[in-house]
Amino acid sequence: MTTHPFSNKRSQLRKLLYAAAAVILLGSLLASYMHWEANHLEFNENTAPAGCVPGLSGLRILVLSDIHTNLPLLEKAATMAEQARPDMIVFLGDLYTDFLRVTNAGDYIAQMKRLSSVAPAYACLGNHDMALADNVERVLKEGGFTLLRNSAAFVSIPRLGNVEFKLVGLGDLREGDFFPDRCMSPRELEENSPMPTIVLSHNPKGRELLGNYRWDLMLSGHTHGGQIKLPFFSTPLLASEGETMHSGFHPYEDKQVFVTRGIGYIGPGRFNCPPEINLITIP
């Protein structure tokens, strides 16, 4: 029996259509999942490595970063913060996404006020904040946050016996606003009587420029944890600027760097890398 050539062509066309439909369906399912994951905020408790900040045992720091104009997740984060009752709160930059127009700054101020009513709150700026710096600084100030932009504050926690430590907030590295010499002490000046020092730096690569300064722990965001992490691949698809520290605690020389995956995202969503806020406890 001879098969008609048009029958073969119809069969091949049918297979192509089925394959195209399957690809479209899988793509739609993947996009839906990535959107769902990107809006499923996690509350994660992290214990710092032993001895990373001497003298501050028991300190509880709530870490938030990279909101990227996502007000609903900021509202969820504020609710989580109210339940966590930390000793202090730090925001590590990128309140907005710089190419998105923001007309509801008052709503962000209200949520930042919720956060700062829980505990003393501090912030540094991220790369997306720089183009909107006046707006961002207003939101932070009216929201009750102390902005540390290449400046430092001396903090004491009554619950811990008012032991004083230094909190440094650096400007953004990528945007050329990174000036540790304005707020940090050279290593040799503190060798005999070092004060516990925690650094807020939106970009964790800032650690590489602090070799001449004394510090104990850096808190950073910026990476979004890689945002898209494929199974069986050690490097996230969206690894930021070749960064090797994507999330969690990482040793660096004799210090520690903690990187949060952050709250918001840019692009299609998240995969295997959900958003988070973190409650860090110093052991």
Model-derived features: where do they sit?
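Membrane-embedded segments
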Residues: G58-F154
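Structural motif
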Residues: I61-V63, V90-L92, Y122, L167-G169, ...
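Short, surface-exposed loop/helix-turn segments at secondary-structure junctions
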Residues: P231-E243
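Conserved catalytic scaffold of divalent metal-dependent phosphoesterases
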Residues: C52, T97, D129-L217, S240-P283
